[in-house]
Structures are given as C-alpha cells and as structure tokens.
Curated annotation (Swiss-Prot):
Record's bilayer topology term: Multi-pass membrane protein
First-listed, main subcellular location of the protein, grouped into a coarse class: membrane
Transmembrane feature ranges: 21-41, 70-90, 98-118, 125-145, 158-178, 199-219, 251-271, 286-306, 313-333
Keywords noted in UniProt: Cell inner membrane, Cell membrane, Ion transport, Iron, Iron transport, Membrane, Transmembrane, Transmembrane helix, Transport
InterPro entries: ABC_BtuC-like (IPR037294), ABC_transptr_permease_BtuC (IPR000522)
Protein name as catalogued: Achromobactin transport system permease protein CbrB
Role, per record: Part of the binding-protein-dependent transport system CbrABCD for uptake of the siderophore achromobactin. Probably responsible for the translocation of the substrate across the membrane.
Organism: Dickeya dadantii (strain 3937)
Gene Ontology MF, one: transmembrane transporter activity
Family in the record: Belongs to the binding-protein-dependent transport system permease family. FecCD subfamily.
Amino acid sequence: MSHAVIPTGRRIAPGQVLAGGGVCLLALAVLSLMVGPVWIAPSQVLGALWHPDPLNVSHILVTSTRLSRTLIAIVVGAGLAVAGALMQVLTRNPLASPGLFGINAGAMFFLIVCVSLFPKVAMSVWLWSAFAGAAVAGCLVWLIGTMGKGSLNPLRMVLAGAAITAMFAAFSQAMLVVNQEGLDTVLFWLAGSVADRELATVLPLMGYCLAALVGALLLSGQVNVLNAGEAIARGLGQRTGRIRLLMSLLVVALAGGAVAMAGSIGFVGLIVPHMARKLLPADHRWLLPGCALLGACLLLLADILARVVIVPQEVPVGVMTALFGAPFFIFLLRRGGRYG
C-alpha cells in the first residue's frame, strides 16, 4: 500500500504570506489604538472610527492622538523597509541601509539650522527642513558616487555616504555648541518617535511616501533585472543608469520622508528585507510589498511596546527598534552578511 509523500520545507504561497501580513498589520493597528496609559476597549475604538462622539473622552483620545501615531508608524515603517530593500540591491550589499545615503545626518543638520534660526515657526517647517536636508545629503552622495565614468559605483557611493554623514554630523555638533537652545528638540528627534505629531502636519509627507511606495512597486520588475547582475541587465537592453537613478530617488523620498516625520529610527531598513527574504521568493514584485507590510508591523509593534514598558512614560520608538535590530545585526555579521 503506497503512501503519499508530503514534501517538507515547502514555502507558503507568496499571496498567503502577504494576506497574513495584512491581517497582522490590521490587528496591530487596532491594538495600537487601544494601548496606552489609558486602555480603550475595542468597541470604543470602533465607535471612535465610525461614529466619533466629541464628548466621549475615549473617542477624543483615539482620533486626536493614537490614530495619527498609528498611521505615521505604518507609513514610516513601510517606507524605511522598502528603502532598505532597494538600497541593498543598489549597492549589492546585504548589510546596506538607507543611512548609507547620509539621510539621517543631512536631516539632522538642516533641522538644527531651522531650529536655531527660526525657533518660533510651526512644526511643519521643521519637518520640511529635515526632509530638505535628507534630499540634499542623498543628492550629494549620488553625485559623488557617479563621478568618473558617469555610472554609479557602489563602493564609491558607500564611501561618499560615510564622508557626507561625517561632514553633516560635524556641522551639527558645531551648531549645537554655538546654540544650546535647540538641543532638547534635536535630542528628541534623534531618539526617533511617532508621538506628538499632528496628522494634518505630516499628511503631505505621508502622501510623498505613499507615492514613492507605489513607484517602487511599479519599478520592481526592473529591480529584479538589475539584481540579476549588471551584465545581464545590459544584455536584456535595460538602461541600468536610469534604473539606479530612479531607485536612488525612491530611497531618498522614502527614507527622507520617514526621517522627517519620525526622526532617526534605525535597523528597520536593514533587518526587514532579510526577514522578507525568508518568507517570500527572491522576486521584488512580491518582496517589496512584503517588506512594506513587515516594516509597518515591526514599527507598530515597537511603538506599542514603547508605550507599556515604563508606564506612564514612553520609551522612544527608535530605542525599541535598536533593541530588536542590534542582536539581529550581530547575527548577520556572524553569518558573513549571507543571511537569507
């Protein structure tokens, strides 16, 4: 009597993985609306979303603070994760992250300049100044990385990113020595947080990030070809220089918008692509949506834990992602960067 052999080690279908990620994201989003110094029942959360009562304290808490930080965490986590996946293809380095473009340092310097020169302006001006700094740093790294033969050299770009980061960090330290008043604001921003952001203030930046996410998904086919190798991509008639330029612009838009909204949040762009590769095939048409879902889930989870670790105070979400990411990064280094 013959027995059917059930194959082991079979991957779950990519569609099922993405569906599961969507369910997890929805569950974490609802939990994020519930959790805090004051816990809110699920029925109250649903009531606040569908029929908000301006006299109900729980409804006010959900709509005024928790909804905005939940949406920001979703967009920022997805943006950083997709930017990290693109960056690893762009540099052909499995340990690359969006920080290689000097985005964090550029955003920090421009923010310090804005706080020092215009301390009384609205927070939206600070956010846009940080986004501008991220864009300037990314453009400088790109220009230096394409010097010489006119094509992007991954090694030159990494070195340029380190140099630009060091330069902006030195400028930032000099500005803080001259002007101590902006130190508290900058330290809060450096720690990384999705709290105390009004939805109306960050909505334009969220729109840019969402548009860049759509652009990354549309470019996923070309990313696959480039990931196969420069020679193969050229042999297939692909304009690799244009693909790299578009990928770089998307990285700057995604990571720059995320940094401007939430500050410096590390490790999401590094560890999420590796997690996604363990669950999904090496096809960026599946991998990039998976990174977006996993990144959003990871940052939401980190933000939820940040609220309950030392109630009634909160731990900056950037600290929580560092606690998750640092051991994972050490693990990747021990594996020689060949994880996944």
